[in-house]
């Protein structure tokens, strides 16, 4: 699959997830088989561009693979300026967020709130596409509410504005992450436009990935929550798509290696004062299968030193062996 001039190595994309898809996580997903990774959402508000938080979220020219960054906002000119700044920093693809269901984002008329205003969507997309010569993609939901699904209308509008690929999460904003993703709307969009369509939502294992591709006709899949604590899901899915066979479960020794490497990278990236806090949620996800009683996770979350975290993890896995 191509996005503009860029050819993905496969049809699997790591989703932009706020507070999760940082540089260490993106690098790990890339190493585990993602054909592309997308940065966590960056605000287009110029007042926060120079903050440490925004700086850490930006992609840079030395990152592996295709460098894609997601931006959010509602002001067309600010969005265009954010596109230019990120392109200058090394972004090769700009993704526009019109799918985030978070209240704090929607209150600012950003994310999925924009789906209620097709005229503003058109203005934003047209302005951003014209701002810099890098491909622009769009991520949406199926609509604002089940009774107001307008993803086909938005998709046609996006194609007319020059959007190079469209990701659709199979829920409306009102659904948040409740219930199940529905794929009829994604299928309808695929049949209505000619740009690449990326299906997103509840793609949790290789069998589901194959089924969603077959049913929707989507060109690619975007995987988010299922990769939390399980970044090797990309490798598992790709192997199944290629061969029709499932990989054996990842050996515990390999889980240990990946987890400790990931936590080390988080400590280095954020610094010892913040890295240990960021690490806690990732460790919880990794160990959901291996620490079902939560006792170790509760103990781990009380640790406030990076080196002690690493020692605790090593001891934990030694006890499991």
UniProtKB/Swiss-Prot annotation:
Gene3D superfamilies the UniProt entry points to: Aldolase class I, Putative flavin oxidoreducatase, domain 2
Stored InterPro entries: Aldolase_TIM, DUS-like_FMN-bd, DUS_fam, DusB, DusB-like, tRNA-dHydroUridine_Synthase_C, tRNA_hU_synthase_CS
CDD domains cross-referenced by the UniProt entry: DUS_like_FMN
Annotated family: Belongs to the Dus family. DusB subfamily.
SS bonds (residue pairs): none
Originating organism: Pectobacterium carotovorum
MF annotations from Gene Ontology: flavin adenine dinucleotide binding; FMN binding; tRNA binding; tRNA dihydrouridine synthase activity
Gene: dusB
Keywords annotated in UniProt: Flavoprotein, FMN, NADP, Oxidoreductase, RNA-binding, tRNA processing, tRNA-binding
Catalytic activity, reaction form: a 5,6-dihydrouridine in tRNA + NAD(+) = a uridine in tRNA + NADH + H(+); a 5,6-dihydrouridine in tRNA + NADP(+) = a uridine in tRNA + NADPH + H(+)
Protein origin, superkingdom: Bacteria
Biological role stated in the UniProt entry: Catalyzes the synthesis of 5,6-dihydrouridine (D), a modified base found in the D-loop of most tRNAs, via the reduction of the C5-C6 double bond in target uridines.
Stated name of the protein: tRNA-dihydrouridine synthase B
Cofactor: FMN
Active-site residues, record numbering mapped to chain: 100 (proton donor)
PROSITE patterns, alphabetized: UPF0034
Binding site for FMN: 16-18, 70, 139, 200-202, 224-225
EC number, UniProt record: 1.3.1.-
């Amino acid at each position: 699959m191509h996005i503009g001039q860029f050819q993905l190595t496969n049809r699997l994309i790591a989703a932009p997830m706020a507070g999760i898809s940082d540089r260490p996580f993106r690098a790990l997903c890339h190493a585990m088989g993602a054909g592309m990774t997308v940065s966590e959402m960056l605000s287009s508000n110029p007042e926060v561009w120079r903050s440490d938080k925004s700086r850490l979220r930006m992609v840079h020219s030395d990152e592996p693979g295709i460098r894609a960054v997601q931006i959010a906002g509602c002001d067309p000119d600010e969005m265009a300026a954010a596109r230019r700044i990120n392109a200058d920093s090394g972004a090769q693809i700009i993704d526009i967020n019109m799918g985030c269901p978070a209240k704090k984002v929607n209150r600012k008329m950003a994310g999925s709130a924009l789906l209620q205003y097709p005229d503003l969507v058109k203005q934003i997309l047209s302005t951003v596409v014209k701002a810099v010569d890098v491909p622009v993609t769009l991520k949406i939901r199926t609509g604002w509410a089940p009774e107001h699904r307008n993803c086909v209308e938005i998709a046609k509008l996006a194609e007319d504005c020059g959007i190079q690929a469209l990701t659709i999460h199979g829920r409306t904003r009102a659904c948040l992450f409740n219930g199940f993703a529905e794929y009829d709307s994604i299928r309808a969009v695929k049949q209505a436009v000619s740009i690449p369509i990326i299906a997103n939502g509840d793609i949790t294992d290789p069998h589901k990935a194959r089924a969603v591709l077959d049913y929707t006709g989507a060109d690619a899949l975007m995987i988010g929550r299922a990769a939390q604590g399980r970044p090797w899901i990309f490798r598992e899915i790709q192997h199944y798509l290629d061969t029709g066979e499932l990989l054996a479960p990842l050996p515990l020794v390999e889980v240990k290696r990946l987890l400790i490497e990931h936590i080390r990278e988080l400590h280095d990236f954020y610094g010892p004062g913040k890295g240990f806090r960021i690490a806690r949620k990732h460790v919880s996800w990794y160990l959901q299968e291996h620490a079902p009683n939560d006792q170790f996770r509760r103990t781990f979350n009380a640790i406030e030193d990076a080196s002690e975290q690493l020692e605790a993890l090593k001891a934990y896995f030694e006890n499991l062996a």
